[in-house]
Amino acid sequence: MKQGLQLRLSQQLAMTPQLQQAIRLLQLSTLELQQELQQALDSNPLLEQTDLHDEVETKEAEDRESLDTVDALEQKEMPEELPLDASWDEIYTAGTPSGNGVDYQDDELPVYQGETTQSLQDYLMWQVELTPFTDTDRAIATSIVDAVDDTGYLTISVEDIVESIGDDEIGLEEVEAVLKRIQRFDPVGVAAKDLRDCLLVQLSQFAKETPWIEEARLIISDHLDLLANHDFRSLMRVTRLKEEVLKEAVNLIQSLDPRPGQSIQTGEPEYVIPDVLVRKVNDRWVVELNSDSLPRLKINQQYAAMGNSTRNDADGQFIRSNLQEARWLIKSLESRNDTLLRVSRCIVEQQQAFFEQGEEFMKPMVLADIAQAVEMHESTISRVTTQKYLHSPRGIFELKYFFSSHVNTEGGGEASSTAIRALVKKLIAAENPAKPLSDSKLTTMLSDQGIMVARRTVAKYRESLSIPPSNQRKQLV
């Protein structure tokens, strides 16, 4: 065995804690980033928050002071740009610049209001407390409400409710009586045993002289399965109703709510703060970061200056360490926002037809298209478009919304799957309710427009729009 020494020259990019921080900030949503920055403000005395007015007035003075102070404290230079554009799969899985351009007025910015929510059970219990129940009936009512799911239906039988109460003196009839009272709470039809029970309870609240009410009750009571299958021919035969009468009765039934519990807001609301604002100015689409969505950070110059003057080595080291962390955080934030703005502007430029004319004009676009245009890695584009939202005259969209697969057209071109989905929705909206378009017919109509897609693909697009198949869309006209 021969031993020896070899010299090998290689280049390797070190994953520093600062670079890890920059990449992590890139992935955070606005709400998550707000929390992150607030924690930094709370823990680092060298960081402070400033508003836009103060930032504009003091920027030049700060820059001069910062250069003198920081150079004296720390000779190590920071890079001009953080190398965020890399595939760092091993890192994490899940004042800042706002760009120059349009000056948004306060009354032009979108307002995003929070909302309070309560569960269906809380809402029902509030009504129980306002209802003159006896103590026994109130206990029964509580057990019934506990058995109601979010759609408004009982999850267990009345017999099981009787058993769960655990009182031998409470019988089935008493529970049924309380149940009937709760079913007339708001929303009417809640705590129903099944769909038939739910619809009949709602129908019972109509005035007796309501037109077609008896015919509607007959259909719900005895022929709900035929109605569910839109088998109107069989319905006319078994009910012996004329077509016009059947149509009116069905319309009355369709005015009822099959899931009354869902009319009550449940769960936590989802808050969305747009990161990017888009508007048209002088025939040009202008893209700006939402400067109001994040706090602006700066170095506290008074504390920074103490790093040289303090005689306590421990205090001096504490100040220098926090100063360096503050500088890196501000730099990381600037890199994040610069990347977000570049990518957003590129997306808007590529999808101008969408902003001008709507979904049907969405262009097919994948991550690689934007990555190539801005000269970044696809993984960077994926991070910066996840949980980042754009506000435009057409609404609020996650940046990922603008990416879609392509479908070949007859002329050798490509169409976006998003555009095809919008076209399917448009065709169905214009169909004859008595003869709704089947998936095969939709496929043919798309083919006539030069879009070549399989029937199963059309079915997938229709289902993604929550549109039922043609046999369930059929209506009497």
UniProtKB/Swiss-Prot annotation:
Which residue intervals are annotated with compositional bias (Basic and acidic residues) in the record?
50-79
Q: Which GO terms describe its cellular component?
A: DNA-directed RNA polymerase complex
Q: Which GO terms describe its molecular function?
A: DNA binding; DNA-binding transcription activator activity; nucleotidyltransferase activity; sigma factor activity
- Region (Disordered), start-end ranges: 44-81
- Which Gene3D superfamilies does the record associate with it? Homeodomain-like, RNA polymerase sigma-54 factor, core-binding domain
- Would you say which domain of life the source belongs to? Bacteria
DNA-binding region(s) from the entry: 366-385
| Keyword entries, A-Z | DNA-binding, DNA-directed RNA polymerase, Nitrogen fixation, Nucleotidyltransferase, Sigma factor, Transcription, Transcription regulation, Transferase
**InterPro entries per the UniProt record, alphabetical:** RNA_pol_sigma_54 (IPR000394), RNA_pol_sigma_54_core-bd (IPR007046), RNA_pol_sigma_54_DNA-bd (IPR007634), RpoN_core-bd_sf (IPR038709)
- Residues annotated as signal peptide: none
- Which GO terms of type biological process are on file? DNA-templated transcription initiation; nitrogen fixation
Query: Which residue numbers does the motif RPON box cover?
Result: 454-462
What's one Pfam family here? Sigma54_DBD
Q: Which family does it belong to?
A: Belongs to the sigma-54 factor family.
PANTHER family linked to this entry:
RNA POLYMERASE SIGMA-54 FACTOR
What is this protein's function?
Sigma factors are initiation factors that promote the attachment of RNA polymerase to specific initiation sites and are then released. This sigma factor is responsible for the expression of the nitrogen fixation genes. The open complex (sigma-54 and core RNA polymerase) serves as the receptor for receipt of the melting signal from the remotely bound activator protein NifA for the expression of the nitrogen fixation proteins.
Name of protein: RNA polymerase sigma-54 factor
